[in-house]
Amino acid sequence: VKIALENVHKSYGARAIVSRVSLSVAQGEIVGLLGPNGAGKTTTFYIATGLEKPNQGSVWLNDQDITLLPIHRRARLGIGYLAQEPSVFRHLTVRENLLLVMEQTEVPRREWNSRIDFLLQEFRLEKVAHTLGIQVSGGERRRTELARALAIGREGPKFLLLDEPFAGVDPIAISEIQQIVARLRDRQIGILITDHNVRETLAITDRAYIMRDGQILASGSSEELYSNPLVRQYYLGDNFQL
């Protein structure tokens, strides 16, 4: 199973933001979408989530055209999305945040508590289960949001699209999130990450796409991109180290 963008184009008036971009994410792999500011990566990412619609091109889930499906319809097909902005309910506890999502799913009520207990343990949130969202740390908030994304649907998502998952958290929390994302890949969840923390993202991706001026400049493994002279010239710079 894979998500694929095929020759997507997005313009605002006469200005092309994304031009004929194609990329794919399969289950069980972590894919990065990176590039300098203004490269079009955020718009491309939003086209993948359903927050933006392309002027041309298409988005596919296997052989199903999902180009025009809004984000909530894609969620029902197993495509989860983690926004950059904090999305925990600040005046609910961590457990209540998970319960609220569980109530919207097809999971039988009798299974709610066991599913929530599993997610709390999986994301190391047991100690803050009864803490209000407004009181948790940045790393705990991010882990709560990831756990909540996995609570959607009876079987959980097939794909997770992560927008700046490393933003606003300290180095220890970044390491924890990297480990969690790697475990999700091991569970055959396909993950697309866009983030300004380049080194932290390339450390866990199986492959990545680098964008420049609305197009794909290069793609490949972290090592391939690191040694690509165009990527170093336009994005990483000469002093970048993996």
Can you describe what each PLM-predicted range is?
Residues 13, 31, 69, 92-111, ...:
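ABC-type ATPase nucleotide-binding domains, specifically the catalytic core motifs of the NBD
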Residues 34-36:
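The feature captures the beta-strand-to-loop junction immediately N-terminal to the Walker
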Residues 49:
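Helix-to-loop junction immediately C-terminal to a conserved catalytic motif
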Residues 53, 65-85, 109-113, 129, ...:
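ABC ATPase NBD coupling module
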Residues 64, 99, 110-128, 182:
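Conserved ABC ATPase "signature" region
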Residues 132-140:
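Conserved ABC ATPase signature
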Residues 160-164:
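Catalytic Walker B motif of ABC-type/P-loop ATPase nucleotide-binding domains
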